[in-house]
Structures are given as structure tokens and as C-alpha cells.
Amino acid sequence: MEYLIGIQGPDYVLVASDRVAASNIVQMKDDHDKMFKMSEKILLLCVGEAGDTVQFAEYIQKNVQLYKMRNGYELSPTAAANFTRRNLADCLRSRTPYHVNLLLAGYDEHEGPALYYMDYLAALAKAPFAAHGYGAFLTLSILDRYYTPTISRERAVELLRKCLEELQKRFILNLPTFSVRIIDKNGIHDLDNISFPKQGS
């Protein structure tokens, strides 16, 4: 039902998520933000069960911020991804597992940009591009065909739009609006939302 996508470039990571909050077959709102700011240069995108997503993402968010307050410096994207994975794995083996799928995007002065894919079973993988949700079945082939490691920001936005247009054409559910952000050495930047006219209007 939900959709996340991330594309890593040579000096940035471009991410997008749909803005629909749904309960069963009912759309509750169409301006829901599924991105959580971990630190100045790390963004966590989270989809899954409605209560689990916010509770787990905010728990990770507060702990990453607590780490900075205690130590005087921020976690790198790699460290944040491994911390998130460990917590998700521990919860999976408890009586209160979280059913969440995640993308973690960030930029580090030494390592450069990074994009991590994580599923609800706490499987973690570093990837040049990634997607979550049923829409991933329709768009991963497009990313595989057109992605290059040296892709410019403009081309990455075009590729993102191509994926979202394919989603509108072939996905049976209505996801009309997407939040888009980019993470680079200067931090997290909001780009214009990508919107499509509602089907049948």
C-alpha cells in the first residue's frame, strides 16, 4: 500500500515517500510525513503498521540525538543503520516485534553519501538504490535500467519522476502525492512535492 524510494548519487542521496495514511481500506489523510530526521545529515524513512512506524522511528530518533548530546558528535549513517538494525532485531525476538520497513539515507564527511535498505526482519543492506512497498515490484526494474553511480541530481529527479509515473500507470491503488528530500554535505533539503491528478478526476 505504501511506497518508499531512495537513489544514491556521487555526493547526495535522493529520497521520496508517499503521503497517504490509511487504515485498512480507508484513506485517513493525504499529507502524512513518513520521513524522520535522525540528525543534521541522516534521514529515516519508515512504513509499516501505523503505530509501529511512529513508535519505532521516534525511539531510534531520540536515541541517536541522545548519543550526540552525550558524546558531542553525531553517529555516521553506517553506525546509525547498524544501531537501528540491532534494535529492530532485538524487538523481533521479543513479545513486541515492530512490523516496519525502513530506508536510511545520510551523508558523512569521510564516507560520503549512504543509502541503507532494511526490512521488518532486520535484514540490512547498503544499496545504490532501493524501494519498499508493492510499488517496488514495478519500479526496481526502471532503477536497474537507468541508474548510474555518477547520476546527476537533475537526472536523479527525472528518474524518480519516471518511477512515480509508472506507479500511477500500473499500480491499482491511488498514491497522488510524494514528499521528496535530498541529503548532501550541507544537510537535508526539501524539494517540491511531486503530485499527480487523482484517478478519475
Curated annotation (Swiss-Prot):
Task: Write down any Gene Ontology CC term.
Answer: proteasome core complex
Acetylation as a keyword of this entry, yes or no, is yes
Q: What is this protein called?
A: Proteasome subunit beta type-2
**What is this protein's gene name?**
PSMB2
What is expression of this protein induced or repressed by?
Up-regulated in ovarian cancer cell lines.
Q: Which residues carry this modification: N-acetylmethionine?
A: M1
Source organism per entry reads Homo sapiens
The record, for Gene3D superfamilies, names:
Glutamine Phosphoribosylpyrophosphate, subunit 1, domain 1 (3.60.20.10)
* Any one biological process term the GO annotation gives: proteasome-mediated ubiquitin-dependent protein catabolic process
Which SUPFAM superfamilies does this entry report, sorted A to Z?
N-terminal nucleophile aminohydrolases (Ntn hydrolases)
Instruction: Provide the alphabetized UniProt keywords.
Output: Acetylation, Cytoplasm, Host-virus interaction, Nucleus, Proteasome
| Chief localization | cytoplasm
Subunit: The 26S proteasome consists of a 20S proteasome core and two 19S regulatory subunits. The 20S proteasome core is a barrel-shaped complex made of 28 subunits that are arranged in four stacked rings. The two outer rings are each formed by seven alpha subunits, and the two inner rings are formed by seven beta subunits. The proteolytic activity is exerted by three beta-subunits PSMB5, PSMB6 and PSMB7. (Microbial infection) Interacts with HIV-1 protein Tat.
The UniProt entry's sequence similarity note says: Belongs to the peptidase T1B family.
Q: Which Pfam families match?
A: Proteasome
Q: Where found? A: Cytoplasm; Nucleus
Cystine crosslinks: none
The UniProt entry, under InterPro entries, shows: Ntn_hydrolases_N, Proteasome_beta2, Proteasome_bsu_CS, Proteasome_sua/b, Proteasome_suB-type
Described purpose of this protein according to its UniProt entry: Non-catalytic component of the 20S core proteasome complex involved in the proteolytic degradation of most intracellular proteins. This complex plays numerous essential roles within the cell by associating with different regulatory particles. Associated with two 19S regulatory particles, forms the 26S proteasome and thus participates in the ATP-dependent degradation of ubiquitinated proteins.
